[in-house]
Amino acid sequence: MKVIFTQDVRGRGQRGQIKEVPDGYAQNYLIKRGLAKQATKAAMSQLKGQQRAEEKHAAEELADAKRMKKILEDDNTVVELSGKAGTDGRMFGSISTKQIATALQKQFDLKIDKRKIELAAPIKALGYVNVPIKLHPEVEAQIRVHIAEK
């Protein structure tokens, strides 16, 4: 019997996959527990529609990420932050990803999750720093952050 898996089943199939399985296994285990449904023409066309919608959604996310990258990497986009520093240019505190995300929201009205900002260690020096941001698995942007003394 051909079934369409509605959930991942270890050792058998993944969600959205169409596979031939024994009749008894399909009726008594997979379909009964809601792990799969019978692969009828209606179910197959519904699955294809869902896959098209998911592809369209993924393409829109990628386009949004590319648009955001263009904005972030513009020469005019410099995130301005300030902090107290000593005479040698070292800060008393540090600048974290949360502060950078908040500054992006306030200065440029761009909402970026702080977890997407890839900062190896908090910034502890004054001046300009290039900070990478992972907008999408395929799109990474660099923003310039300027840390000035208060």
Curated annotation (Swiss-Prot):
Gene Ontology terms describing biological process: translation
Residues in the signal sequence: none
Superkingdom of origin organism: Bacteria
Keyword Cell cycle among record annotations: no
Keywords assigned by UniProt, alphabetized: Ribonucleoprotein, Ribosomal protein, RNA-binding, rRNA-binding
GO cellular component, one term: ribonucleoprotein complex
Protein function: Binds to the 23S rRNA.
Family membership noted in the UniProt record: Belongs to the bacterial ribosomal protein bL9 family.
Name the UniProt record assigns to this protein: Large ribosomal subunit protein bL9
Gene giving rise to this polypeptide: rplI
